[in-house]
Swiss-Prot record:
Alphabetized PROSITE patterns for the sequence: TBC_RABGAP
One GO MF term attached to the UniProt entry: GTPase activator activity
Coiled-coil portions: 500-636
Protein name: Putative GTPase-activating protein C1620.12c
Compartments (UniProt record): Nucleus; Cytoplasm
Chain segments carrying region Disordered: 96-120
InterPro entries in the cross-refs: Rab-GAP-TBC_dom, Rab-GAP_TBC_sf, Rab_GAP_TBC_domain
Location of the Rab-GAP TBC domain: 215-408
Keyword vocabulary terms for this entry: Coiled coil, Cytoplasm, GTPase activation, Nucleus
Organism from which the protein derives: Schizosaccharomyces pombe (strain 972 / ATCC 24843)
């Protein structure tokens, strides 16, 4: 691939050199006039206008954000909703993003905005000035020797060289000539006065990106990004001005997250400016996220993953353009669910696409993932949200962002498939899901890191060979038309697995119920065994008692038989003895009767004697009473 790029580059340089030698004299004579006329013919160039609308939330001091207080007025143009949505499908059928990520309905209402040629902003970048100057010439032959254009190209080369960006493959005039927006297209010959509303084709942009080693030059990113994501809709700028003055309940949490997370880790390079990038301020990040969270309230966004993308756009463009570019980038790229707090659909779709591609390219890897029950790549979401900036340098992460702007979710699929194919042996030998999680949480890009140059690299890791990674990813034979079938198959398998899991849960519940019943029965059996033991002991005791009672009964029966025999043998003797005893008793009774008669006589005599004694007693009592009275009278007489 690099050989073909070098060959095309050398041929382009030779052709440009020949044109320069032929038209040098002619263009030098007209150079000054052309450079003056270029500023007058830039009606439809990318101009910058202020967007504070006297809004306190949009006003910034120059110390805070000197480079970000402008907005591209050329983006304030209406765009038919269906044409820009079908743009990728018409121009690049082989790299078409996934369907189902069309812009939200708020995109549909447009209003035309006319920008007069007198409102030319002096804050244009060198690339925008180069585009304006090139448009004033109209063709390559007349523009190639313009002193103004040459000075701008020289400045662009210097800017790129200061950032260690190779400029040998960059043809600035081709980048300036490529149509990026609808107004860059030539007028229709049949109706010259009609303005073009259809978006320009993407094929020239893609060819230039391929020639530049699949990378957009840093000075061109501002315009090319907006062109790739179709962010030329002026109603988003108006909406941004409205949302910036609207109260947001998430402002406190957004400020807290920005204060805690900004300019740390992958965000640290955005703290400083460069020759092609602006310095990003925390206030500009807050304004963009404030408007973005108000723009889409259908889901709850996670603020931390949005920080890197927001800083990337703010480092190249103003707040309004960064807002609409962020909206279009997330909506059209199909990566919206990377930034949602509770994400499930992308978790399934991303893994479904990766697993489907692995099933076509390396069935052993797909079978291994299925064997260890892998169903999610959510561990990689923070790295995917920042274009692997946590493992790459900022220029390399921005290169990946260029490819994501072109391919969308498909590029993430290609990058992950390339990594998994590179680590095929490691994945095939995995035996548990814990090993897979450990692999994702470790250095996933280890297979693409360059060999060690120093003996010890304790504090830093070796750089990643991004060219090899991107070339391997784009060289994969992936058919994007199979993506819907991958998703449907995965949805079917997930539904089957869900059904099986539900059945398994029901069986587990039934098993638990049966286990509890068995436990209860076992406890009942233990109790019954105890009762059975008690009853068996009682039965044995009863049997012993019964045997003893039977023995006693036999003895009693024998005694009774003996008694009966004895009674049968001695009845007469008993009768005689009874008669004798009766006669004796009769005699004794007669004696008692005689004794009773004598006793009665004695009792009568005693009764008579008792009567006499009682009579004497009464007489004595009377005598005693008389004596007492006499005694009292005598005693009283002696007292007196």
């Amino acid at each position: 691939m690099s050989k073909s790029v070098n060959a095309s580059l050398s041929s382009a340089i030779n052709s440009v050199t020949l044109v320069k030698q032929e038209n040098l004299k002619e263009n030098l004579q007209n150079g000054s006039a052309v450079s003056v006329g270029s500023s007058e013919s830039s009606n439809h160039s990318m101009k910058e206008i202020s967007l504070d609308y006297s809004s306190p939330s949009l006003q910034q001091t120059e110390e805070q954000d000197r480079e970000l207080n402008f907005i591209d007025s050329s983006m304030l143009r209406p765009t038919p909703p269906q044409e820009s949505d079908n743009r990728l499908a018409v121009e690049k059928p082989n790299i078409q993003p996934l369907q189902g990520h069309s812009p939200v309905p708020s995109f549909m209402s447009t209003a035309s905005t006319n920008i007069s040629s007198s409102k030319i902003n002096n804050n244009q970048t060198e690339f925008e000035q180069l585009r304006d100057s090139y448009k004033s010439h109209g063709d390559l032959n007349s523009a190639i020797n313009d002193s103004r254009i040459q000075s701008i190209i020289f400045e662009l080369n210097q800017q790129c060289e200061k950032e260690s960006i190779p400029v040998s493959n960059i043809d600035w005039l081709q980048w300036a000539s490529v149509p990026l927006f609808a107004y860059d297209l030539p007028p229709d010959p049949s109706n010259p006065n009609a303005t073009s509303s259809s978006p320009p084709p993407l094929t020239p942009i893609l060819e230039l990106i391929k020639q530049n080693n699949f990378c957009i030059p840093s000075p061109c990113r501002k315009l090319v990004w907006q062109s790739l994501v179709s962010a030329e809709r002026n109603e988003l700028l108006t909406l941004y001005a409205t949302l910036s003055t609207t109260n947001n309940s998430l402002d406190s949490s957004i400020r807290k997250i920005i204060r805690m997370q900004s300019f740390r880790g992958p965000l640290e390079p955005f703290k400083y400016s460069s020759t092609t990038r602006h310095k990003v301020s925390t206030e500009s990040i807050f304004h963009v996220l404030h408007a973005f969270t108000l723009f889409d309230t259908t889901v709850e966004y996670n603020i931390e993953p949005l920080l890197w993308l927001t800083c990337a756009f703010l480092s190249y463009m103003a707040q309004g353009n960064a807002f609409r570019s962020l909206v279009c980038f997330i909506q059209r790229g199909g990566i919206r669910e990377f930034f949602i707090s509770q994400s499930s659909s992308l978790d399934e779709s991303l893994f479904a696409l990766v697993w489907g591609c692995l099933g076509d390219l390396a069935p052993s890897v797909a079978i291994s993932l299925q064997r260890i029950k892998v169903s999610s790549l959510c561990i990689l979401y923070p790295s995917l949200a920042c274009c692997f900036a946590d493992s790459l340098q900022l220029p390399e992460a921005l290169r990946l962002m260029d490819l994501i702007a072109i391919y969308g979710l498909e590029m993430f699929v290609r990058l992950l498939v390339a990594i998994f194919l590179k680590d095929r042996d490691k994945i095939v030998n995995m035996v548990s899901h814990e090993q897979w999680v450990k692999y994702l949480r470790s250095d996933v890009l280890a297979s693409y890191r360059q060999p060690l140059v120093q003996k010890y690299t304790f504090y830093t890791r070796t750089p990643v060979d991004l060219n090899a990674w991107v070339e391997d990813s784009l060289a994969l034979n992936i058919d994007t038309t199979q993506f819907p079938s991958y998703l449907s198959y995965h949805e079917t398998s997930v539904s089957h697995n869900t059904y099986r899991q539900n059945n398994l849960e029901e069986l587990k519940n039934q098993n638990d119920y049966l286990t509890s019943q068995i436990t209860n029965l076992e406890e009942g059996m233990v109790m019954l065994n105890k009762e059975n033991t008690k009853l068996s002991e009682a039965l044995s005791n009863h049997r012993v008692t019964r045997s003893e009672m039977e023995e006693a009964t036999e003895i009693l029966k024998n005694n009774s038989a003996d008694l009966k025999a004895q009674l049968e043998k001695q009845p007469q003797e008993l009768e005689n003895r009874l008669l004798q005893e009766i006669s004796i008793l009769k005699q004794r009774n007669q004696k008692f009767l005689k004794n009773n008669a004598t006793s009665i006589q004695q009792i009568q005599y005693l009764d008579e004697e008792l009567g006499k004694t009682l009579k004497q007693l009464n007489d004595l009592k009377e005598k005693h009473a008389q004596l007492q009275t006499k005694w009292k009278s005598v005693s009283e007489m002696f007292r007196n």
